[in-house]
Curated annotation (Swiss-Prot):
UniProt entry tagged with the keyword Repeat: no
GO terms under biological process: DNA recombination; DNA repair; SOS response
Protein name: Protein RecA
Family stated for the protein in its record: Belongs to the RecA family.
Gene Ontology MF terms in the entry: ATP binding; ATP hydrolysis activity; ATP-dependent DNA damage sensor activity; damaged DNA binding; single-stranded DNA binding
Binding positions (ATP): 66-73
Pfam entry (one): RecA
NCBIfam families to which the protein is assigned, alphabetical: tigrfam_recA
Region (Disordered): 326-374
Subcellular location field: Cytoplasm
Primary location: cytoplasm
Keywords: ATP-binding, Cytoplasm, DNA damage, DNA recombination, DNA repair, DNA-binding, Nucleotide-binding, SOS response
UniProt keyword DNA repair, yes or no: yes
Length: 374
């Protein structure tokens, strides 16, 4: 009897909450529809896999940080381009006043429809972010960067004045306001951040990010991006080998890493990443300098194979789909259910590939190999 009275009291409380705050303000978790996490692809298949859900999650706060010239803005611009290609509206808050529209265009960004703001101070920037997010019309908003969100008091004050904790308080207040609106409108906010060094640290990493601790707590995903190698064509530097570590992830297991190439003037090399992932997962076979996919030679050397995939986007999409299916990333449950043998079918060519002698494969695809080599 007591249990029944408690249930009646709970039902009455739930009904009162709904009347006062609206339908959906409180509910049993079992009554909530569990929809798959919507994502925005990053432009790198390896990073999409490392994130565990196939890209940057919608409706969340994301922080991208790293040293100077490590690829932070490039990575973010690829996400902007992918959001626009899916029909989404994107805003870019350029607090650094350093966005290069020509470079953004080369990465696939539709600069004519990109909403751009170059605010005068941090309060103005975050107020603009709040208003745009609450409009419910955006899919992605980028803030570049947290370090450039200078409080109004600091701008109006003298050069030597001390303003301890002003920026941290500003960020904390802004994140408290926008986090709920981001989730309700399914808008992703990407904050680009810079690194600073703490003085007097004897043990552990002296590196820290700007803007206080609030962003660390509110971010669902934090990406640490680093340049690990310079790519060269002869003696000329043509790009960077980049490593991204997922240091925080609330939507999938964290601490995974991804490596990919960023080519100067071109951005992330999607095709280069597909070749690396294809070899790693057995879909692309590497014999000496030659790269082969299902009996067809892609080219001699990674650069030729990369160009071949760039000229054949359908083939690149096919390889990407098989990689994601095998790793269970970016595939909805209903797709897996309708294609139960997809993984086995896609893995079959990779298993069979080593049994095929290299000379036979070369003869079968002589014309393609010649084209790729040239």
């Amino acid at each position: 009897m007591a249990g029944t009275d408690r249930e009646k009291a709970l039902d009455a409380a739930l009904a009162q909450i709904e009347r006062q705050f609206g339908k959906g303000a409180v509910m049993r978790m079992g009554d909530r529809t569990n929809e798959p996490i919507e994502v925005i692809p990053t432009g790198s298949t390896a990073l999409d896999v490392a994130l565990g859900v196939g890209g940057i999650p919608r409706g969340r706060v994301v922080e991208v940080y790293g040293p100077e010239s490590s690829g932070k803005t490039t990575l973010t611009l690829h996400a902007v381009a992918n959001a626009q290609k899916a029909g989404g509206q994107v805003a870019f808050v350029d607090a650094e006043h350093a966005l290069d529209p020509e470079y953004a265009k080369k990465l696939g960004v539709d600069i004519d429809n990109l909403i751009l703001s170059q605010p005068d101070n941090g309060e103005q920037a975050l107020e603009i972010v709040d208003m745009l997010v609450r409009s419910g019309a955006l899919d992605l908003i980028v803030i570049d960067s947290v370090a450039a969100l200078v409080p109004r008091a600091e701008i109006e004050g003298e050069m030597g004045d001390s303003h301890v904790g002003l920026q941290a308080r500003l960020m904390s207040q802004a994140l408290r306001k926008i986090t709920s609106a981001l989730n309700q409108s399914k808008t992703t906010a990407i904050f680009i951040n810079q690194l600073r060094e703490k003085i007097g640290v004897m043990f552990g990493s002296p590196e820290t990010t700007t803007g206080g601790r609030a962003l660390k707590f509110y971010a669902s995903v934090r990406l640490d991006i680093r340049r690990i190698e310079t790519l060269k064509d002869g003696t000329d530097a043509v790009g960077n080998r980049t490593r991204v570590k997922v240091v925080k992830n609330k939507v999938a297991p964290p601490f995974k890493q991804a490596e990919f190439d960023i080519l100067y003037g071109q951005g992330i090399s999607r095709e280069g990443g597909l070749i690396d992932m294809g070899v790693e997962n057995g879909f692309v076979r590497k014999a000496g300098a030659w790269y082969t996919y299902e009996g067809d030679q892609l080219g001699q050397g990674k650069e030729n194979a990369r160009n071949f995939l760039k000229d054949n986007p359908d083939l690149a999409n096919e390889i990407e789909k098989k990689i994601k299916q095998k790793l269970g990333v970016g595939v909805h449950p209903e797709e897996s259910a309708t294609e139960p043998g997809a993984d086995a079918a896609s893995a079959a060519p990779a298993d069979a590939a080593p049994a095929v002698p290299a000379p036979t494969t070369a003869k079968a695809t002589k014309s393609k190999a010649t084209a790729a080599k040239s």
